[in-house]
Amino acid sequence: MDSNIKQPRLITFYAATGHLMMHMFAAFYFVIVLAIEDDWNFSYDELINLWLLGSLLVGLGSIPAGWLSDRWSRSGMLAIMFIGLGTSSILCGFSNNKFSLMINLSALGLFCSIYHPAGISWVVNLSLIHI
């Protein structure tokens, strides 16, 4: 296969995978909380509020993530996002109290914030090279 064709396909694959993971990981908690509600004997509202800081960090973290991706490395930031999403989601699974779950969900939100500023600019810059 010609490398000129292979490169854009890899870019598309990694960009689509990153985008899918970012949105899926941010949305999983709303389903998982239904099982946690019974196991931990907390109300749905109490458990949903644990995602408040994480959801704020999805938006607020995008500003420094974009700044860092512009000055350092877009692909490096995406690698950090993939590793961070995996690590923080595993830590969420090991959480056994509300405080640790809130901290780990906040980390998940922070790593989710990386995709849009780093991933979109990465795709645009690389697509301009291959036009």
Where are these regions (language model features)?
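Extracytoplasmic
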Residues: 14-44
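Short hydrophobic/aromatic, small-residue-rich stretches within specific transmembrane helices
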Residues: 48-55
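Cytoplasmic helix-loop-helix junction between adjacent transmembrane helices
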Residues: 104-129
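Residue-level signature of mid-helix packing/kink "hotspots" within the transmembrane helices
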Residues: 27, 55-63
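Paired small-residue
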Residues: 88, 99-107
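Conserved MFS/SLC helix-loop-helix module at the cytosolic interface between two early adjacent transmembrane helices
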Residues: 60-96
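Hydrophobic alpha-helix/TM-entry signal in multi-pass membrane transporters
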Residues: 11-16, 78, 101
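Small-residue-mediated transmembrane helix hinge/kink sites in multi-pass secondary transporters
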Residues: 34, 63-67, 120-121
